[in-house]
Amino acid sequence: MKSSMQLISTLFFLVILVVAPGMKMVVEGQPQLCETKSLNYRGLCLKWRSCKRVCISEGFPDGRCKGFFNNKCVCRKPCALLSTEN
């Protein structure tokens, strides 16, 4: 009985590890963030403050370094919700 519970626990943990990275937490009332690669930032993005400064100059409210080996400066803004009302 103990080994079957351990097996079930292990399988559940593995399923969570596989499924969790693809999940997004949606908080009601907060807009989704849209991201685009900065047009003016050059080189590897190592300092998020300099990335943010460049993104602000491009008209975005925020910017962050994104990536692990190949860091890029990514500018972010709240996504516009399209209204379907006429």
Swiss-Prot record:
Residues 1-29 form the signal peptide. Keywords: Antimicrobial, Disulfide bond, Fungicide, Plant defense, Pyrrolidone carboxylic acid, Secreted, Signal. Transmembrane segments: none annotated. It is found in: Secreted. One of its GO terms (biological process) is killing of cells of another organism. The modification Pyrrolidone carboxylic acid is found at residue 30. One of its GO terms (cellular component) is extracellular region. It holds the Pfam family Gamma-thionin. InterPro entries: Defensin_plant, Scorpion_toxin-like, Scorpion_toxin-like_sf. Its main location: secreted. Disulfide bonds join 34-79, 45-65, 51-73, 55-75. Belongs to the DEFL family. This is Putative defensin-like protein 9. The gene is LCR76.
